[in-house]
UniProtKB/Swiss-Prot annotation:
The gene is ins-17. Expressed in head neurons and the uterus. Involved in the regulation of the larval diapause. SUPFAM superfamilies: Insulin-like. This is Insulin-like peptide 17. Disruption phenotype: 33% reduction in the larval diapause in the presence of dauer pheromone compared to wild-type. One of its GO terms (cellular component) is extracellular region. Residues 1-19 form the signal peptide. Disulfide bonds: none annotated. It is found in: Secreted. GO terms for biological process: dauer larval development.
């Protein structure tokens, strides 16, 4: 009925199809699916937090600051230092110029 050669050919074909994932389906996306936060369009992802890329951006952006803003007006949620939170946010989700402006010259 079936020859050994035919069975081997059928098994090798099934193994090749399974290896390329042709029978697999992607997992359905539900409301409970955890997605990593996406970077905002036009934002800078500066990783690692506090690394050379963040320091370079900080040194380039802060001299461009035009108006003074109180740091406590915008960022007063009490969860650690503003600089540390900004560095982590810039690495995880990306940050814009205005996010870094808020930490420029906090004493001036």
């Amino acid at each position: 009925m079936f020859s050994t050669r035919g069975v081997l050919l059928l098994l090798s074909l099934m193994a090749a199809v399974a290896a390329f994932g042709l029978f697999s389906r992607p997992a359905p996306i539900t409301r409970d699916t955890i997605r990593p936060p996406r970077a905002k369009h036009g934002s800078l992802k500066l990783c690692p937090p506090g690394g050379a890329s963040f320091l370079d951006a900080f040194n380039l952006i802060c001299p461009m600051r035009r108006r003074r803003r109180s740091v406590s007006e915008n960022y007063n949620d009490g969860g650690g230092s503003l600089l540390g939170r900004t560095m982590n946010m810039c690495c995880e989700t990306g940050c814009e110029f205005t996010d870094i402006f808020a930490i420029c010259n906090p004493f001036g």
